Each structure stands twice: as structure tokens, then as C-alpha cells.
């Protein structure tokens, strides 16, 4: 099974201010996951990024520089999708018949973010993603494929991937690939999301379509594309959760 702790290979540093909705989620003071600002007061990330003490940074590019664009928030409540199997967080083992479905979670910030050039909300998708489309994933995840050595960059990285048929992922991974997941990668290998990119966005043809969820280690292996939570499947849950928990 893939390591479920959070999950860029073959990417490059993103352009400054090209990713103002990108969130860096910390557990206490250590970087853990990416996320996306979906509302001034709400961040969407992966459910497997759940922790007991969130620190959330917006407006970041280099995590090791003092950036005047940065905004820092605590979290007043977390809402993992009720269908996600939280037992996956414990010993990273799963009961038979369980899978990595519904890997998304909302975090409510202690106060609304201030919208600036470096901090913006990303719109949810309004149409189905198109197979074969070019997608961009971004994050501060490992730039080394692992599993023995992971190396984390200072600056956020962006990588171009292709949206593939789910059968490519089903053939590549022993775990179940469901209709609420997207499959994206680069089949020759060498480009992929990796450990620490989880919870970040997958943007296809300019529209936000996925959340980085899980994949194979070493990252970027040929014919082993990664799995992303399919956002359009969850619009009602996202909107209802935000509305019901002001």
C-alpha cells in the first residue's frame, strides 16, 4: 500500500504570484501538506493530512524566507469527508475492502484571509475534466523520488501532467481506483507529485479539478501515474459543509 502520510518530481519553481490560492499546512512547526483556499475562511486539503494542531500559511512562495505577502492562521475546526476511512491514519494499514476514497477535508480558519495579489480564492470546477488535458500540480513536496531519501525544496514547485483514464492507475496500483478519483501523470516517468504535495491542487485546462491524494513510491516511476481526489464529485458536500458551519 502507498504510504499515506502526505504525498514534485520533474517540475520547476512556479512563477511568483501564479498560485495565490496555494496553502501550506503545518503540524505545529513542521510542513505537512498543501491545500487550497476555497473561501476566505476555508481551506480544502486531503483528509489524510488530518492532524491535531494545524498551522496554515497563505501567500507563501519560499517557506524559508520572511515574506511580506504571507498570512498566518490557526484552524478552529476540521471536517474530513465522512466517507474517508480515518483508520488509514493510524498504522497506515487498512481493512480488506477499504480504500483511499473520499480523501478530502475542509479546514475552517480562525478568521477570514485578506484577499491580495498573493492570496486569492480558487473557484471550484463547473464542468467535468477532459481526458488527455494538460494539468498542473504544485506544492512543496519532495523533489527526490524516495523512498529512502526525500528532499524538500524551499520554493514551491509546479509540474505539468496529463489527465489519464482511470484504467492506467488501476493497472498500476494494487489499491482500488474509484469513480471519485482522477488519474494523472507522465507515463514515461520522471514527472509526478510526491510526498508532501498531498492536499494541493491539480488544475486541468485552467480549471481546478483535483486534490493530490496518493501514488507509488518512488515517485515518478514509469507507468505509475498518481491519484487525485475528483473535486466535481464533491461540490455539494463542500458547499453544504461551509454553509452549515459558519
UniProtKB/Swiss-Prot annotation:
Its EC number is 3.4.21.35. It catalyses: Preferential cleavage of Arg-|-Xaa bonds in small molecule substrates. Highly selective action to release kallidin (lysyl-bradykinin) from kininogen involves hydrolysis of Met-|-Xaa or Leu-|-Xaa. One of its GO terms (cellular component) is secretory granule. GO terms for biological process: regulation of systemic arterial blood pressure; zymogen activation. Residues 8-243 form the Peptidase S1 domain. One of its GO terms (molecular function) is serine-type endopeptidase activity. Glycans are attached at residues 85, 239. Glandular kallikreins cleave Met-Lys and Arg-Ser bonds in kininogen to release Lys-bradykinin. Belongs to the peptidase S1 family. Kallikrein subfamily. This is Glandular kallikrein.
Amino acid at each position: 500500500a502507498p504510504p499515506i502520510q502526505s504525498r514534485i518530481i520533474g517540475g520547476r519553481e512556479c512563477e511568483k504570484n501564479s498560485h495565490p490560492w496555494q496553502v501550506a499546512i503545518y503540524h505545529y512547526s513542521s510542513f505537512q501538506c498543501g491545500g487550497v483556499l476555497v473561501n476566505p475562511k476555508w481551506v480544502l486539503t486531503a483528509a489524510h493530512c488530518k492532524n491535531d494542531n494545524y498551522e496554515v500559511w497563505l501567500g507563501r512562495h519560499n517557506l524559508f524566507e520572511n515574506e511580506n505577502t504571507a498570512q498566518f492562521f490557526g484552524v478552529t475546526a476540521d471536517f474530513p469527508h465522512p466517507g474517508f476511512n480515518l483508520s488509514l491514519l493510524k498504522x497506515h494499514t487498512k481493512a480488506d475492502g477499504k480504500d483511499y476514497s473520499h480523501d478530502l477535508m475542509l479546514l475552517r480558519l480562525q478568521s477570514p484571509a485578506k484577499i491580495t495579489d498573493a492570496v486569492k480564492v480558487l473557484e471550484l470546477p463547473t464542468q467535468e475534466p477532459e481526458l488527455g488535458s494538460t494539468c498542473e500540480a504544485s506544492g512543496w513536496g519532495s523533489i527526490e523520488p524516495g523512498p529512502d531519501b526525500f528532499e524538500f525544496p524551499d520554493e514551491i514547485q509546479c509540474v505539468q501532467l496529463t489527465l489519464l483514464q482511470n484504467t492506467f492507475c488501476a493497472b498500476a496500483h494494487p489499491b482500488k481506483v474509484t469513480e471519485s478519483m482522477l488519474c494523472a501523470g507522465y507515463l514515461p516517468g520522471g514527472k509526478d507529485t510526491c510526498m508532501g504535495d498531498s492536499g494541493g491542487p491539480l488544475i486541468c485546462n485552467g480549471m481546478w479539478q483535483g486534490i493530490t491524494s496518493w501514488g507509488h513510491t518512488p515517485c515518478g516511476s514509469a507507468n505509475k501515474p498518481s491519484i487525485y481526489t475528483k473535486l466535481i464529485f464533491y461540490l455539494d458536500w463542500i458547499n453544504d459543509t461551509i454553509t452549515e458551519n459558519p
